[in-house]
């Protein structure tokens, strides 16, 4: 919906097979750039677009968006404080069936080490939409970690204010001395 109102939003992708992007690719072809399997170049393109005043979203598989292009991310989005939002899919062992080259267990540490980064690991579609709304309203260098699977909504009653201030205790706690702290997909198990 945001692309319908703002032609200064660009979406870059390194993922050839993401059927979820088909509609976006067709409807907004002038704002959708397919960069091929070239994550490093894609981050350089993103930096150039951001330097021209655009809001840039970059999408790729987690292990390649993080480790493969970390220097470009650090120098562009990080050191120049550019409004680039990185969206990775298949975090953790999301693509374990593809072997260890597709594991993404270091991505959080990589981006946490870059000055000015904001890292988000949504647990469902609802919280993902809140994160996107926040980033579109306040463009900044950010990293969104998505699971490979579509996760059912776990907390559809949260508001933008809850998101901005942090989440509270869910459920009833009766004199128990236990705390479960989680995020992303694992929140469903808690």
Model regions and ranges:
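Condensing-enzyme catalytic core mediating Claisen C-C bond formation in acyl metabolism
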Residues: 157-179
